[in-house]
Amino acid sequence: MKAKMDKRKRFLMWSILLIAMVQMPNLALSPSINQINTVVFPDKGLSTIQTVMQIPNLISPFITITMAWLISRGLVTKRVSIIGGLFLVAATGALALIFNTQFWHLILLSCCLGLGLSGYISTASSLIVDNFNEGERQMISGFQTSFINGGGIIMSLCGGLLGTLMWYGGYMMLLLALPVAIIALFAIPKIPRQRKTEDGKNIGSARLHSDVFMYGAFIFVFMLVYNVIGSNLSTHLSGMGNSAVSGYATAIQMCGGVVCGLFFGRLSRRIGDYTTVLSFLVIFIGMTLLSLFPNSMAVTCVAVFIAGMGMSLMLPQCMFSVSKVVTPRTSALATSITSCICPSFGGFFSAMVFTNITTKLFGPSTVMRYRFVSFVALACAVIVFAIVTYRKNRKKEEIPAA
């Protein structure tokens, strides 16, 4: 597939994959959550710290939808949005060197990070829809998730190590966005702001297909569950070492995503949307192991590796399925919903929902939190299986009628 691409498309593909590597900078920060909670700001509760760290997930949807609207109106190009976002993320890393002593500094950094991420996460994904054919999109979607997880490994490992030196050390990893922005300057074509037909009208319908919202709902619920793993690892492993240990565990979690992403294309061609069901099942298995063997680092590594595979099953499948029902006119908005708005809201509300619910039911135990959410993931797998099967059977019934 890659051999059929011309040089321009290959350069663009690699640029998109490099952008994917700086798509999860929060993983560079999560290893320090326990240190921030117990040492830096001990007067703040764990839920409060987790929520502030998830502010980017609250800001991103609103800024992303605004950028998608501006892009669809031809007021801003995708190139400007992506490059501007990358530079802002890099600037956030530099700001952390100055603003790192007050609690409002933590809020400020989270807001700046959210603004930067809003510029490129979904917009970069829409470049895949606009510039590649269906076979190429299926392949690149899997590779993109592998690079997201690969970047997450680098972020979590280095962020955990830097976090042992200073609580804001993880923010230094955001500076990696700077060289990526420079590469994007040359790789992303200066395409017309809005492609037109010969009679001057916009290409395609302006209405979003209903499937976009269904896959967006899948992603929202998935991230609501998936984020419980990373946001609680630091606390769960606090008895086994410092933030570096949490960083290693997070890196192993991302390894699961990398490995699974490499095989996503083949798996997707065989089972289609059932990969979304599988994503919830691996979360169930991983969290169950975490809750059953809380004192075993070896089992913890296996558990997070298995759970990490979930992201490389859910996200690329939903993105690929959405790419088949969008038009050039709706690609920016559709990818904003599925790659930023829904996962961001899921990530933001994750701590608010599950940390608060499980704390009231079982106390601060992360063991019981993982156990509770594992059964939520299992229930989600059953529901999604029913939805996918129903849709598949309905399509079979519609074929003869057509």
Give the ranges of each region predicted by the language model.
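Intracellular juxtamembrane helix-capping segments at the cytosolic ends
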Residues: 119-132, 313-327
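Cytoplasmic helix-loop-helix junction between adjacent transmembrane helices
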Residues: 109-147
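Helix-loop-helix hairpin linking two adjacent transmembrane segments in secondary transporters
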Residues: 143-189
